[in-house]
Amino acid sequence: TVIVDKTSQRILSRETATKTIMTVRTDEGTAGQPVPQTQRNHQVVDDATAIELARHGTQIEALYGLPVDIEWAISDGKIAILQARPITSLPPAPLKDVRWDPPRPGTVWMRRQIVEHMPEPLSPLFDELYLRHGLDHSMETLTVFMSDLSGVKIDLWAFLDPPFAASVNGYAYSIASFNFGLSLLPLALRVYTLVLPKMIRHLLPRWRDESLPGYRAIIADWKGIDLANAPDEELLRGVRALATEDANYWFAAAVALGLARITDAVLNRFVRLVSNGSHLTSGSFLRGLPSKAVDAQVQLEAVARRIDGSDALRQLVLDTPASRLLTALAEHPEGQVVMDDLQQYLDTYGHQIYNLDFAAPTLADAPLPVLLSLKTAVANPERDARARQARLAQERELLVARTEQSLNPIQRPIFKRLLGWAQRYSPYREEALFYVGAAWPALRRLAQELGQRLTQAGSLDVPDDVFYLESAELAAASMARAEGVSRPDLAKLARERRTLR
């Protein structure tokens, strides 16, 4: 590999690989032969030839006005250009002069908590509606709840300056700089002594009995909207409302997540302390508990059992690549019942996400992992997720009994108390996370309907570009559509932002 600077025509680097096989001409065409030992580390081209090749490449690139892939040959010291074609898979050039400055000078920002679920650069609409507006709104809602619960007027913004989260070069960060001046000390003491204990007692029931049912009810309301007849403004209002509600849900669920994490860590620390080198961890005592993941696998295994009842369907599922399985089932005379089962599965579990940004597809939008799991379940009909869960639970109880017997009278009640807390709160963590992003199928349905309308009006290139404009820009595009006018400038802006992301 030789790298030449096309401007200065200088060799920047050279890496000579060991060559073991060479292609030679024969009477029948070509054949591969071993490279003689003395030639295996020879350079293919010298510096002068490499520079000459770079000069030819620069001229061809200038002629066509775009990067090109060039094939060449050398015979008797003369370079012959055989072919030149555009490079279609060239990644974008690195951005220049990129700075990673905090949103506010002198503050610390980290990728933790909620932003850990945002692994990639954010889409502009998610950045606006969720990261900036939604999370700050949910902080204010939490402040009101804490004040009403404790009777103490609390202003969380006194401890940290808004916003709670912001993006830097497209990546999400949350604030990690807090105000702990002497003037806030009395309020901080009251929060820790009076408010925090009440919050721990009340926030878990609030998440389970109020926030989660309320969140799901709002999702159901927006799922029922008449897409075809809803005005553009209503579609955008639904996107904004669902984004805000999911942010509210995150903070409501935070106490369940926190309690599960803390009780697990404390139990793990205690077990490691008293296990006398047995390498036990808290996870051994939390196996076989109620689990949404197990529930999902049980439902998928039920679909597999239905397929197993038909030799034709079973062979179809086993022989068809997962990427083409839905099409194959739709075309099969017995496939509709399986399609219905899969749709029911996705209605329950399809909102699950790998990236909290609602521009990213949900499991229902990109169900390849489900189809791969279904093929595995059909190929292994003896597997039973519920039976395995029961077996793990039985092993867990035997381990608990053995551990209790091994502890002394002082350690035993401590272990029981810590185990009870961890087993109580551990299932809440999975359930709380299960509903994060639950609004996204409904939100994406609204957004893509709006995107389809704006695409037909000439203000977007494709419906999914709706995620690359902010709400004010979408409102402007809708207003132009109502007037029979297109906004190609917004289509260009969305296209540029998508490329940047």
Regions flagged by a language model, labelled:
Residues 1-29, 82-131:
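Extended active-site and interfacial segments that coordinate phosphate-rich ligands
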Residues 73-75, 82-87, 469:
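Generic beta-strand/beta-sheet core signal
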Residues 33-73:
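A long amphipathic alpha-helix within ATP-dependent nucleotide-binding catalytic cores
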Residues 14, 19, 33, 43, ...:
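Flexible, active-site-adjacent loop/turn segments at secondary-structure boundaries
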Residues 2-45, 368-376, 382:
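Conserved catalytic core of nucleic-acid polymerases
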Residues 68, 80-83:
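Protein kinase-like catalytic core scaffold
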Residues 43, 47, 62-68, 76, ...:
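Contiguous hydrophobic, helix-prone segments at protein termini
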